[in-house]
């Protein structure tokens, strides 16, 4: 149980102190769980200001300013990209950190409430499901142009000429990939360092989505952001892949094939992390994902992921969303169990 000051955990009659920045690590965990539940219920209302948009605005501002100052010199662009990354992650971590520290000094419950709201806005579970289902409903209406438009909101590839099959694959791929980027990775960093560390992660992820491209504009300037994103997702992507395999079994999909394709195709992507979850989705649903796509008008060659056991269908979008939700719950429960295991180990060592 918890002590009244929200700074300690009572296990077996012993008090264990886990206080951090004026609030407790237990408070972080409680905020994580509460924020996750709020996200499942409310998602991201369009009228509510979103902190990730503020991070995006900061990235856009620094992007234009730095590139205008640096010109076309490769070394200067590499350095400028590093300056961008350091500046954005510094702001993204320190602002919520000191807000929570100040709130914790005023009242621990105020700090918990603020961190819960932060965690809620960081998660993207319901938003990802809702946006991908807009693609699904457009396909059911046989409105391919509308489906292309809806897909363009959640993918980076060119969607103007995509067929219905390619639209479905794009939606399945982005749900699978963003299961890691939008839910499990933020959850992982919240578990380690609360909302501030999760905001730091989201800032890296946002920079990668805005400047981490291998095109003429960002090949050098965006390299640091892209590499940082690869590093930040290294562990969460693999946690997501493993959890998705178990989620596929819970959802009644092809567990054995999910494991097989994960093990075989988990590196079949230009990113070292993206295929970790996409391979599981392909295997669980008995479909083939990946392949070549156009980005900013240029053809990008990609390996395929999975076997073409059957043709894709709109229902696959609903199926991958079920895997998304099951994966999120599995990871949430796993992190809670890890927390209590660590607490019990520390308690036993202190008693000894």
What residues fall within each predicted segment?
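Hydrophobic alpha-helical transmembrane segments
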Residues: 3, 12-200, 204, 212-352
């Amino acid at each position: 149980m918890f002590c009244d000051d929200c700074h300690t955990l009572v296990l077996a009659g012993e008090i264990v102190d886990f206080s951090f920045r004026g609030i407790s690590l237990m408070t972080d965990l409680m905020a994580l769980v509460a924020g996750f539940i709020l996200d499942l219920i409310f998602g991201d209302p369009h009228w509510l200001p979103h902190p990730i948009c503020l991070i995006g605005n900061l990235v856009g501002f620094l992007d234009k300013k730095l590139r205008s100052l640096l010109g076309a010199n490769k070394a200067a662009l590499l350095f400028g990209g590093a300056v961008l990354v350091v500046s954005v992650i510094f702001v993204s971590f320190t602002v919520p950190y000191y807000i929570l520290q100040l709130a914790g000094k005023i009242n621990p419950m105020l700090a918990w409430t603020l961190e819960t709201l932060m965690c809620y806005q960081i998660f993207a579970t319901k938003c990802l499901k809702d946006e991908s289902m807009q693609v699904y409903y457009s396909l059911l209406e046989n409105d391919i142009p509308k489906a292309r438009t809806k897909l363009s909101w959640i993918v980076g590839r060119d969607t103007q000429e995509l067929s219905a099959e390619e639209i479905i694959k794009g939606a399945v791929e982005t749900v699978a990939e963003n299961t890691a980027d939008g839910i499990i990775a933020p959850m992982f960093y919240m578990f380690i360092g609360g909302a501030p560390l999760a905001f730091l992660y989201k800032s890296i992820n946002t920079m990668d989505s805005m400047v981490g491209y291998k095109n003429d504009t960002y090949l050098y300037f965006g390299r640091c952001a892209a590499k940082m994103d690869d590093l930040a997702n290294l562990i969460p992507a693999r946690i997501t892949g493993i959890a998705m395999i178990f989620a596929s079994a819970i959802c009644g999909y092809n567990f054995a094939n999910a494991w097989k394709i994960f093990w075989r195709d988990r590196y079949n992507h230009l990113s070292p992390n993206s295929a970790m979850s996409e391979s599981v989705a392909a295997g669980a649903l008995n479909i083939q994902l990946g392949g070549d796509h156009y980005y900013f008008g240029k053809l990008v060659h990609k390996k395929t992921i999975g076997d073409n056991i059957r043709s894709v269908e709109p229902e696959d979008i609903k199926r991958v969303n079920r895997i998304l939700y099951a994966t999120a719950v599995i990871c949430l429960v796993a992190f809670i169990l890890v927390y209590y295991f660590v607490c019990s180990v520390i308690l036993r060592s202190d008693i000894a």
